[in-house]
Amino acid sequence: MMSNLYTIPKELEPRTQSIYRQRVPRKIWQTMKTNAVPRKMGEWAETWIKLNPEYHYNFVDDDEVIQFIRTNFPGYLQAFERLKHGASRADLWRYLVIYKYGGVYADLDCLCRNPLKDWIDPDAAYVTQLGVNKDVCQWLIISVPGNPIFLRAAERALHNVLNDLASAEYYGFEFHRGKLELRRPEALIKIEDPVLGLAGPPILQEAAEDCFKNQTCPEIFEQTQVVCISEKTSCNFKGKVKHDYGNKDYLEGLKQLHVPHY
C-alpha cells in the first residue's frame, strides 16, 4: 500500500497573463501511470507549475494517453496496445502529443530551475540540447506543433513495434556557427535494446537525422535553438533544468507505482 502520495493536478489553466511573444505554445505536458504519485515526483512537477504560471499545465495518466491516441491517431492504437513497457508507451505518446499540440514535454524526473520565458528564444521552432552522444533531447522536448521530426519518430516507433524491431543507428549532430551538422560516418552509434531501441531516445535521434538528411523540414533546423552541448555528463539545458535520472527517491517512487525504470 502506498503512503505519502501527492496528487498532481490533471489540468491547470494559466494563472497569469503572458505579455511576451513566443512561437512555442505555452503548454506543459507530463505523464505517469496515475496522477497520485510519491511526494518527490509531485514536488518536481510543481516546479514546472510554479515557475511557469503563464503556461497551461496538463498531466495525462495512462487511461487518458490511450484515449488521446484512439481519438487523434487511431492508426497507432493497435501498435500502442502491443507495447508492454510503460516507458515505451510514454515515448510514443510524447511524440504524438507534441506533434499535435506543441509545447513543452518534461519527464517526471526532470525539474525546472528557471522560468521557461527566461531562456526559450521567442523565434525558436524547436529548443533542445545535444546529449553526451550528441543526440537531441528526449526527456525534455520543446517545439511548435506540426514538427515533422516527431511524426517521423512516431512512424519509426510504429514500424518497430509492428515488425518486432528494437534497434537504431545514428551519428549525432555537431553545432557550428549556429547551425546543426551531422557528424562524420565514423561516429556511427548502434543501439540494440528492447526499450530504448523500440521508441526511445535513439529513435527520436534517427528521426531528426532523417529529416535533416532528406531536407523535409529545413525551416525547423533553421529555427532550432541549441541551448548547450553535453560532454561527459548532461549539460541540463545550461542548468535551466535538472534531469535527475537515477534519483533514489524517484526510483523508489516507480517501485511504489509498479512502473519499471529504463
Regions found by a protein language model. Give the residues of each.
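Small-residue hinge/turn detector
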Residues: 91-103
